[in-house]
A protein has these predicted regions:
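Conserved "HGTGT" condensation-loop signature of ketosynthase/thiolase-family condensing enzymes
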Residues: 1-156, 168, 176-179, 191-195, ...
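Short beta->alpha junction loops
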Residues: 159-165
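Internal active-site segments that recognize and position negatively charged phosphoryl groups
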Residues: 173
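Short aromatic-hydrophobic micro-motifs that form the base-stacking/packing surface
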Residues: 187
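Short, high-confidence coil segments that cap the C-terminus of an alpha-helix
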Residues: 182-184
Length: 207
């Protein structure tokens, strides 16, 4: 018998969803490509008398009350991930079987803005006064838990965290799940955000 390799197992891309500075969805992405490069906005960094260029997702882009009604206490990182995941599932045209659908989220830094907000609160208010909601949103798997809750998915879920090639690793894992028949389809995504600490590091190390 000829040995079987994972590279022989082909995957199909069925749907795409995205949330970015230019808006939400394929149409917004197509418009952004047609417009070409757009200058970033400048955001101020606390503790530094400087402003740095960043691409910011507008608040109105995240204003989907129907979809986000279950996650009023979620942070921006999780909201962006949920909206993109819901759009990808809708774009695929699949009638999702929640038990046979997997979810893999790739991220380099996770919800690091929320993580540092939590640490700041410990310093400012002490361990006994920190909001448990902020802590629950700071863990790397929080966004995936929101995705599965909002989309009623009960299949295997995982967050892949790597500083480099996180999305490629997530695709490899999805390929394994499909080859092993753990699920019939896998929702694979990548999410990261530029928080205050990241802007500080960017200023100190890259400028």
């Amino acid at each position: 018998m000829r040995p079987w390799s994972l590279g022989e197992y082909k995957m199909n891309l069925l749907g795409i969803g995205m949330v970015f500075r230019g808006g939400r969805g394929i149409d917004c992405y197509e418009n952004a490509l047609k417009q070409g490069w757009q200058p970033p906005v400048e955001c101020e960094i606390r503790h530094l008398n400087k402003r740095l260029p960043v691409y910011v997702v507008a608040d109105e882009t995240l204003a989907d009350k129907l979809l986000l009604k279950k996650m009023r206490r979620a942070d921006r990182f999780s909201k962006m991930a949920v909206l993109a995941a819901a759009d990808a599932l809708r774009d695929s045209g699949l009638e999702s079987d929640g038990q046979r659908t997997g979810v893999i989220l790739a991220t380099s830094f996770g919800a690091h803005q929320t993580t540092f907000d939590f640490l700041d609160d410990i310093i400012d208010y002490g361990e006994g006064q920190v909001s448990p909601t902020i802590f629950s949103n700071s863990v790397h798997n929080a966004a995936v838990s929101y995705i599965t809750s909002v989309l009623d998915i009960t299949g295997p879920t995982l967050t892949v965290t790597r500083f480099s090639f996180a999305f490629q690793s997530a695709l490899q894992l999805a390929q394994l799940w499909l080859a092993d028949r753990r699920c019939d389809s896998v929702l694979v995504g990548a999410a990261d955000q530029c928080g205050e600490v990241m802007r500080y590091i960017f200023d100190r190390k890259l400028f």
